[in-house]
Amino acid sequence: MTLGRIHGYLGRLEEGVVDEVRPERHGVALLTPSLPLVWQLNALRVEDPAAGPVTLVEEADRALADLGHRKLVVHDADLGVRLARPLAATGWNVLRLLVMVRDRPPERAVARDAGAEVDRRTGAAGLAAFRREQPFGWPEEAVDQLAAMDERYDRAALARDFASPVREPACVCRLYRADGLAQIDEVGTVEARRGEGHASAAVLAAADAAAAEGCDPVFLLTDASDWPHKWYRTLGFSEIGSVYEFLKLPLGGARP
């Protein structure tokens, strides 16, 4: 089953990019003390479908005690639904991520040379420019730690960068490959160049490259509550499931 393969891939990748994988009673702690500002690399992945919200909060407090945030990752959508309301009521941010696979041609054609693969230096510069513009007030240290995170994906998922336009990128995205699957991630367009079709060109270039190399499925994760999922549908992606993330910032601070 496609969704099961994607869940398996996500689990292996999550463990492949962190400093430490530590079993907990109701899941697995994914820890990267060397990059404490990168929430994505410091979380508790819940694996017990019977675990309740109070128990999981206590476990996250223990597992992530040295960090300024708390994060739960839940691949089981049914469990995510059950946890969403009680966790939201106690101040947790609830993020439902749609799993979308490319299963048809895009609705609109994009010029063949509008987007293409670029070298790591170009991709890194484009992502850094996008991240600095985000409304969360990321400090430069967080931008640097996110760049270090990208290097981990280079190793664990043979990550590559795609951009549009190629010479002076307005949009950059990343392509991960493992186990015959491909994931498009970190899609970002600088504010001054939005609405010009660069994101479509970059994403389609990455998706086409993955498909040409035999990857199946080609998929991405996107926030169910935000508009991009509608745009991804126009690029030929369809929803097949969802995963959940829960985030709490007890100490406040900038979003990495």
Question: Where do the language-model regions lie?
Answer:
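Conserved beta-hairpin
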Residues: 21-25, 82-93, 155-173
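Conserved acetyl-CoA-binding loop-helix of GNAT-fold acetyltransferases
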Residues: 53-61, 186-191, 195-212, 234
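Conserved active-site alpha-helix within GNAT-family acetyltransferase domains
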Residues: 79-93, 200, 224-242
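Acyl-donor-binding surface of acyltransferase catalytic domains
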Residues: 49-126, 244-248
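Flexible, substrate/cofactor-facing loop regions flanked by secondary structure
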Residues: 112-182
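Conserved beta-strand in the GNAT
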Residues: 25-32, 95-99, 168-177, 181-188, ...
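Conserved GNAT acetyl-CoA-binding A-motif
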Residues: 65-76, 210-223
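N-terminal charged segments
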Residues: 1-67, 79-80, 155
